Amino acid sequence: MRLNTLSPAAGSKSAPKRVGRGIGSGLGKTAGRGHKGQKSRSGGGVRVGFEGGQMPLKIRLPKFGFTSRRALVTAEVRLLELAKVNGDVVDLNALKDANVITRNIQFAKIVLSGTIDRPVTVKGLKVTKGARAAIEAAGGKIEE
């Protein structure tokens, strides 16, 4: 068997529809578009969300909420992800170096998800109550 001799099994691939190629094809003349109207024209069709001129649902409904700018640069870190960090000190830069969080993250919070089996020192990160208990139970400590 060679790469240049590979081919799909017989009958597994159907040929694409060839539209506008005569009456006998079943898709001749209007090519399956019907007669006249906007959708039969080249480039015909309406934009996403257009409702024929009536007030669209998106505009009929009220605006609500907002996107916190801080949330865009904040990350949650699970306990089991702390195992990827080399060394005993876990801080923002250590998490970035271990590719646990991306470079644009400015704040991180450690949450209780999974387990931690080695003592680590957490510096300058927020920690949930459950994660704090798990880190201290493993012999680690948290420094604000």
From Swiss-Prot:
Binds to the 23S rRNA. It comes from the Bacteria. Residues 21-31 have a biased composition (Gly residues). This is Large ribosomal subunit protein uL15. Belongs to the universal ribosomal protein uL15 family. Residues 1-49 are annotated as: Disordered. PANTHER family: 50S RIBOSOMAL PROTEIN L15 (PTHR12934), LARGE RIBOSOMAL SUBUNIT PROTEIN UL15M (PTHR12934:SF11). Part of the 50S ribosomal subunit. Keywords: Ribonucleoprotein, Ribosomal protein, RNA-binding, rRNA-binding. GO terms for molecular function: rRNA binding; structural constituent of ribosome. Gene3D superfamilies: 3.100.10.10. One of its GO terms (cellular component) is cytosolic large ribosomal subunit. GO terms for biological process: translation. HAMAP family: Ribosomal_uL15.
